[in-house]
Structure formats: C-alpha cells, structure tokens
C-alpha cells in the first residue's frame, strides 16, 4: 500500500464523513450519552450519597468486588471501565456502517475503483477516517470525565492509564471488527445485525472480566482480552475473507 494514496483518500473520506449528517449525529449523540452523560450522573449520585444499586453491587459475592470498600472504588473500577468499553466499541462500528457499508449500498464504489488505487488502500483510508472521527468525538468526552475524577479527588493520577487502556483497546478492537463487518455486510440491515453479533459478546466478556478479576489490574486484563478479540477479527478479515470481497 502507498502512503501517499492513503493520505489523499483519507482527506476525501474525512470530508465525506463530515458532510454526512446522519453519520455525524449518530457518532456524536451516542458517545455523549455513554461517555459523558452517564459518567456525570454517576458522579452526581456519588456526591449525594450514592444509590441503592451501587451499594448492592458493592456487597456482591463476585470475586472482583471483594476488595471494593466504598462506592467511589466501584465507580472507578467497574462502572467507568464498562462505559468506556461500551463507547469505544460502539462509536467506530456505527460510524463504519454509515461511512462504508452505505457506500456499497448506494453503488458509489465504481468512482473510487476508477482511480489508480487498490482496494486495500481504499479500505485503509476509510478505517483511518473512522478512527479520526472516533478520536475527534470520543476523546474530548473521556478527557473531561477523567479530569473531573482528578479534580474531585475520586481517583489518582495512576487511575488515568488504567481507565484509558480499556477504552483505547475497545476502539482498536472495534476498528478490526469494522473491517470484518465491511467485508461481510451488503446493506444496513445486515451490517446492524452483524455489528450486534460482534459487539455484544465483547461487552459480555468485559462485564464478566470486571466482575471476576479483582484489583486495579482488572482494566488491563480487559484491555488484553479486547486486543485479542480485535486480532482474531483482523486475522479473519485478512485470511478467510478476501479484501476483494468488498467489490462484490
């Protein structure tokens, strides 16, 4: 693949995504709820003395909660990682549906194929554009929430990488899943069904790991699992599903 071709295509894809109101609205609203509004609501609940749900989960017999001694720990070590993973998984996959699958459905690929570029370069540029949109929209929400944790004294500086690790791993995993989704899906309906089939198991594994693994290392374990899932999706996309399938 040629980096010059990818850069040119990336600029074109980023501009095209910016003009797609449906894609941008979906990419903006869902992360706002998952990565910003829900964490802020948890902070408000904690400030006013917690909630019954938090207290019940803190007293759960699950081994992952054995070392949790107060609601703030529960929020930082369980709820926030879960929300960050959810946002990191959903944002790229939803953007991919509008950015890539919709183009196949509209039969507008012929214009791109007529250019002196390969299918691999087209896909690389599209996925990099999805990654750019994810960073542009998702990272500010995450940065605000993590800054509030530090300002309010709920978490220390060492907690920041522990929370960023599962989020970044979820984004990487979702990008790899998006590549596989791009090669398999033919229309919006198929893309949405496949997206749920890929993302839901990753979310269930995340929740199970957070509940089963104790201590601050739990988020890093989640990150490793998500990266492993992403690697499997990438291998499946490159080895068992031909990139040329994108043209079919």
Each predicted region: which residue ranges?
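Aromatic- and glycine-rich beta-strand/loop motifs that create alpha-glucan
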Residues: 1-31
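Hydrophobic alpha-helical transmembrane segments of multi-pass membrane transport/permease proteins
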Residues: 19-53, 79-92, 197-209, 227-234
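Selective transmembrane-helix segments that form parts of the transport pathway or gating/packing helices
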Residues: 87, 92, 117-146
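Transmembrane helix boundary and interhelical loop/hinge segments in multi-pass membrane proteins
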Residues: 92-113, 127
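Junction motif at the cytosolic side of a transmembrane helix
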Residues: 100, 184, 228-248
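Secretory targeting signals
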Residues: 132-173
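Hydrophobic alpha-helical transmembrane segments of polytopic membrane proteins
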Residues: 162-185, 232
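Extracellular/periplasmic helix-loop-helix junctions in multi-pass membrane proteins
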Residues: 184-192, 207-224
């Amino acid at each position: 693949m040629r980096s010059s071709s990818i850069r040119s295509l990336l600029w074109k894809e980023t501009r095209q995504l910016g003009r797609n109101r449906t894609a941008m609205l979906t990419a903006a609203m869902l992360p706002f709820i998952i990565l910003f509004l829900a964490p802020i609501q948890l902070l408000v609940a904690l400030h006013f003395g917690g909630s019954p749900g938090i207290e019940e989960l803190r007293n759960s017999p699950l081994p992952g909660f054995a070392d949790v001694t107060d609601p703030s720990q529960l929020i930082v070590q369980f709820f926030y990682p879960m929300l960050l993973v959810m946002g990191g998984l959903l944002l790229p996959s939803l953007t991919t549906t509008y950015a890539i699958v919709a183009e196949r459905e509209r039969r507008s690929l012929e214009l791109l194929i007529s250019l002196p570029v390969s299918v691999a370069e087209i896909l690389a540029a599209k996925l990099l554009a999805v990654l750019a949109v994810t960073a542009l929209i998702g990272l500010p929400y995450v940065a605000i929430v993590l800054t509030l944790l530090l300002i309010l004294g709920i978490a220390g500086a060492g907690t920041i990488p522990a929370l960023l690790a599962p989020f970044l791993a979820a984004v990487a995993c979702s990008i790899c899943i998006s590549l596989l989704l791009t090669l398999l899906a033919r229309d919006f309906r198929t893309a949405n069904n496949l997206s749920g089939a890929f993302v839901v198991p990753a979310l269930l594994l995340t929740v199970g790991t957070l509940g089963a693994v104790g201590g601050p290392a739990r988020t890093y374990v989640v990150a490793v699992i998500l990266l492993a899932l992403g690697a499997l999706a990438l291998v499946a996309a490159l080895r068992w599903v031909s990139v040329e399938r994108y043209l079919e």
